[in-house]
């Protein structure tokens, strides 16, 4: 089944992304702002962090372009602002498609949690999908490289400050551990039934 967005994300020519303003509980206030402009007290922007994991329990990461204002050249997960009129699920699907050319279906998406980070309401998702790196189409102003890494590799990269330290990282690790336990349990049940 194909998932389509009924409207194009709102962008004005010559300006940044137009985003909804939220309250601390994640409710839209009915107001918008141009990304990069300051927010008043009690105003927040919704962002998504998308953790793509494959069947080998590896995580797909991307190296931020050297043109980026924030954290240029740093390895990170796939993330971005939820645009005005867009849901966080739509942003979760849109951001990786724009940045690296991966097509994600809603059935592959698991909402992990929401965390408050300053003025950011960060909705965190895990996407279960295998992806051939040779199929990547990089958005040059955003991404300079992509690669699959193990959790162990990622921990080492974070300790060397090569990978951005996300507050939800250990929630993603827990998700992978629980997924591995479910796989092992199914495998054991299959062997017992033979």
Go through each PLM region and give its residues.
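The catalytic Nudix box helix
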Residues: 60-61, 77-110
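Local beta-strand/beta-hairpin segments that build beta-sheet-rich folds
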Residues: 29, 110-112
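Recognition helices and adjacent regulatory flanks at domain boundaries
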Residues: 68, 94-98, 125
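Short loop segments at secondary-structure junctions
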Residues: 25, 54-57, 65, 128-133, ...
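A glycine-rich, hydrophobic loop/mini-helix early in the fold
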Residues: 47-79
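Nudix hydrolase/Nudix homology domain
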Residues: 2-3, 36, 72-73, 84, ...
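Acidic, metal-coordinating catalytic segment for phosphate/diphosphate chemistry
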Residues: 6-49, 53-55
